[in-house]
C-alpha cells in the first residue's frame, strides 16, 4: 500500500513539474493609434457606419464615434 502511494505521489509531482515548465503562449496585442477620419463629414452619430467607413475607405483596423470637443467625431484606429 505504501509503495503505490509513493508511486502516485511521484507521478503527481512529475505532472506538476512538467506543467510548471510549460510556458503559456502570450500573444502581444498590436498597439493601435487613433486619428480623425479623413473621409467622414459632419457629426458622428452612428459608430457602425463610422467603423465600416474607416475599415473600407481608409484601411483602418477599427473605427468609432468619439466625443472630441465640441462634437462627436468619427475616429479611425490604425496600427502604430
UniProtKB/Swiss-Prot annotation:
Keyword rRNA-binding: no
Modified residues (Pyrrolidone carboxylic acid): 30
Tissue specificity comment: Expressed predominantly in siliques and dry seeds.
Keyword rRNA-binding attached: no
Cell location: Secreted
GO cellular component: extracellular region
PROSITE patterns: GAMMA_THIONIN (PS00940)
A Pfam family the protein falls into: Gamma-thionin
GO biological process: defense response; defense response to fungus; killing of cells of another organism
Keywords: Antimicrobial, Disulfide bond, Fungicide, Plant defense, Pyrrolidone carboxylic acid, Secreted, Signal
InterPro entries found in the cross-reference section: Defensin_plant (IPR008176), Scorpion_toxin-like (IPR003614), Scorpion_toxin-like_sf (IPR036574)
Disulfide bridge partners, by residue number: 33-80, 44-65, 50-74, 54-76
SMART domains in the cross-refs: Knot1
Signal peptide: 1-29
Record's subunit section: Forms oligomers in its native state.
Function: Confers broad-spectrum resistance to pathogens. Possesses antifungal activity sensitive to inorganic cations in vitro.
Family: Belongs to the DEFL family.
Protein name per its UniProtKB record: Defensin-like protein 13
Organism for this UniProt entry: Arabidopsis thaliana (Mouse-ear cress)
Amino acid at each position: 500500500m505504501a509503495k503505490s502511494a509513493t508511486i502516485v505521489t511521484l507521478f503527481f509531482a512529475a505532472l506538476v513539474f512538467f506543467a510548471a515548465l510549460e510556458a503559456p503562449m502570450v500573444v502581444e496585442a498590436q498597439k493601435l493609434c487613433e486619428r480623425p477620419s479623413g473621409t467622414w463629414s459632419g457629426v458622428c452619430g452612428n459608430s457602425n457606419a463610422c467603423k465600416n467607413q474607416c475599415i473600407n475607405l481608409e484601411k483602418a483596423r477599427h473605427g468609432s464615434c468619439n466625443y472630441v470637443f465640441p462634437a462627436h467625431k468619427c475616429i479611425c484606429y490604425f496600427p502604430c
